[in-house]
Design a protein with these regions (language model features):
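A short, conserved structural fragment
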Residues: 56-69
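A short glycine/serine-rich beta->alpha loop
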Residues: 3, 69-70
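Short alpha-helical segments that sit at the start of domains
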Residues: 1-27
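Short acidic, hydrophobic short linear motifs in intrinsically disordered regions
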Residues: 26-39
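Short amphipathic alpha-helical interaction segments
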Residues: 42-58, 74
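Short, amphipathic alpha-helical interaction segments positioned at domain boundaries
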Residues: 74-101
């Protein structure tokens, strides 16, 4: 993966955390999250899936997803307390870049 793709992936992760922080306290569907990310340009489903796997994976757990097996974009997603800490910059993750940095 080239450096530009790596940077784009890190920025998308930061954007997802930021958007979920804006809606903290409310579970939203991945469809809605994708719409919130429109300002970042067209987000491909595959890139969003990779981002969700990264942010919700073992050792991270910044987000939680209640998976809808029939339509993954209809799954519910929300920020965990660890995700709030990341959004508030109480903790750092080298794999996440926030747009304001």
């Amino acid at each position: 993966m080239d450096q530009l793709k790596v940077a784009e992936a890190k920025l998308l992760r930061g954007a997802v955390i930021s958007k979920l922080y804006m809606t903290y306290g409310t579970d939203i569907r991945i469809y809605a999250l994708k719409n919130l990310l429109r300002s970042k340009g067209l987000v491909q489903d595959e890139d969003l899936k990779k981002t969700i796997f990264y942010l919700g994976g073992d050792g991270k757990r910044y987000i939680h997803v209640e998976v809808n097996k029939e339509e993954w974009r209809d799954s519910m997603i929300w920020l965990t307390p660890a995700g709030v800490n990341l959004a508030e910059k109480d903790i750092e993750d080298v794999g996440v870049i926030f747009d304001d940095e």
